[in-house]
Regions:
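Active-site anion-handling motifs in enzyme catalytic cores
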Residues: 1-386
Length: 386
């Protein structure tokens, strides 16, 4: 049973694929909890508990990993968000409906906090994931604990799901979203992505990454997944910009946010960039992300945009999907990242000159980090059980 001396905290995450931003967010929350409540019993519910344990298992001394809520969402007999949300709540109240996860359901009965951490995995792209919000709300109610969601990107919402999302959010004690469409949907104040809690951790200088050669001038992170523009169009736009900017190929570096997925666009242009460097996800995670204000970035990925801009780097964000990635990148532009947004790679004549404006003002990054820390204190404040 949870006690004030050893509370039970249950984090719902999408880490473990891996995808740089998802692991960055989870590691940030675990490091925060390790600093303030190292004695707490911490559980992380994710679709890939084994890989997640290997990636972030050292971030808190008492963290353990499971996949109960994700399994329940997958087990629901429909893709319809309303039916998934209803089914997982029935299963939590009647574990016989999902006997393979009985022990995990029992565990949820003693949690102090159920925290659905960011970012953008509860939306129309993955309609079953709305069950995570429903399960978190139901579990907290059953246990007499607190439900929180932070840094959520709920856009684009599944058709017809808006009333359900609003109703579920009203059952959470703490609700924070990271973009304007999500804030309008729930009629809540606009917040920021959870990665602001931990930006700067896991960063190294380019000189540390490449001690024996000049550092790259231009960094690329180019994804092939969820890419409505097409990998060939993205490849063509990037190659065009590099040539117009007169960047020597040996001063270009490609960074992976998702292993292999972020190699495919580069594979189309690497023969035109002899000497370009490749920095795999394993190095990003194990050695650190090489960042400096002297760099220029071209990124399709949201969290690489955020991390590089927070280090003061200039950049171009390519919005590879209008309803999803454009919303994500726009949220950072609205905060002052200073980057240039491109959402039409086919019109090469309109591609921008090399940006020189820099990234976020450091005072902005520090203010957003402090705001997130205050939110963290509210989420993990002691629970008064009736």
């Amino acid at each position: 049973v949870a006690t004030p001396e050893a509370p039970v905290y249950y984090l719902v995450s999408t880490a473990g694929f891996p995808n740089f931003g998802d692991e960055l967010i989870l590691r940030g929350w675990l490091r925060y909890l390790a600093a303030v409540v190292p004695h707490a019993e911490v559980w992380v519910d994710t679709h890939s508990p084994g890989p997640t344990a290997l990636l972030v298992g050292d971030a808190h001394p008492r963290v353990r990993f499971t996949d109960t809520l994700w399994r329940l969402c997958w087990e629901a007999p429909s893709e319809d968000p309303w039916e998934v949300a209803a089914w997982v709540q029935h299963a939590l109240r009647n574990p016989g409906m999902a006997p393979r996860w009985h022990q995990g359901i029992v565990l949820l009965g003693r949690v102090d906090v159920v925290h659905v951490i960011g970012g953008g995995y509860v939306n129309a792209i993955w309609p079953r994931h709305i069950g995570l919000l429903a399960a978190a709300a139901a579990a907290a109610e059953h246990a007499g604990g607190r439900a929180a969601m932070t840094g959520q990107g709920l856009s684009p919402a599944s058709a017809g799901s808006a009333p359900l999302l609003v109703a579920l959010a009203e059952r959470f004690e703490v609700v924070e979203v990271r973009d304007a469409p999500s804030a309008r949907l729930l009629d809540v104040p606009l917040g920021v992505d959870d990665a602001f809690l931990t930006l700067g951790h896991g960063v190294i200088t380019p000189e540390q990454a490449w001690p024996d050669q000049p550092p790259p001038e231009v960094m690329l992170c180019l994804q092939s997944d969820l890419n409505e523009l097409g990998t060939s169009n993205v490849a063509g736009a990037v190659l065009t910009m590099l040539r117009r900017w007169r960047v020597p190929p040996e001063r270009v570096c490609v960074v992976e946010g998702i292993p292999r997925v972020d190699r495919e666009v580069f594979a189309l242009i690497e023969h035109e960039l002899p000497g370009a460097r490749f920095y795999p996800f394993a190095d990003v995670w194990n050695r650190g992300l090489p960042l400096s204000a002297a760099q220029t970035w071209i990124s399709t990925r949201f969290h690489l945009h955020m991390a590089a801009a927070a280090a003061g780097a200039s950049g171009v964000a390519i919005a590879i999907s209008r309803d999803y990635y454009r919303t994500k990148h726009q949220s950072l532009l609205d905060l002052g990242s200073g980057w240039t947004l491109v959402d039409d790679c086919a019109d090469t004549a309109a591609l921008p000159a090399r940006p020189r404006a820099g990234g976020f003002d450091r005072h902005t990054v520090e203010r957003l980090r402090k705001d997130k820390l205050q939110l963290a204190k509210a989420i993990y404040a002691p629970i008064s059980r009736r």
